């Protein structure tokens, strides 16, 4: 039997609530990217379904994705839908094991089958394009000039709906492959926090990290109650480490103290 094509399944879920509140899936979709010859990736299977979350949809979530309780009343449940996310199309003996999403931690909290390998197009984007105006998938869609259709194999493509967002994320992922980011590197990037180019919250939103006072990073790491996104904590701690080392190098202290501080910073994840 021939080896199956290498497939990365880009998934997206719409939910009954907004993070960090507990929520259930009310719509699921995927768009496959398939590599048949080296680093040439093309679109494969496409699928989308409303999901009965067996719980009411919060009105704030409803205002984002426009999925109502009436729309999902007769839809299949999550337990009925989830196996489809693993099936290779056309259905074969092997299952999909490589998944991608934009902010993959959200999808993984809802769907993380044993043995799954994950790629995060958001973290890839920060790594490849730190100077992008934003790393949200719809912003990247237009910033990158992605040419996407309004209808995908009979499914309408709408922003803030599962298929529309999966389709955009798949386009972003394909561009990331084209620009030379290897799948193995993507997997490593997804498994670790990334250094954010700027924060998008609080009094210093949008500023360069170099323009933010040290006290703000100290507040994030030591004094605030959070909970913080791991990337935010990693960024704040990394900036503090760099600034402390810089101050030590400028101060007339014992060189062994500087070396010890550098070694301590290098040991941190």
Tell where the protein language model's regions lie, with residue ranges.
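Generic detection of long, well-ordered alpha-helical segments
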Residues: 75, 163-166, 210
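Generic helix-packing signal
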Residues: 65, 129, 145, 170-174, ...
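Acidic, divalent-metal-coordinating active-site segment for phosphoryl/phosphodiester hydrolysis
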Residues: 161-173
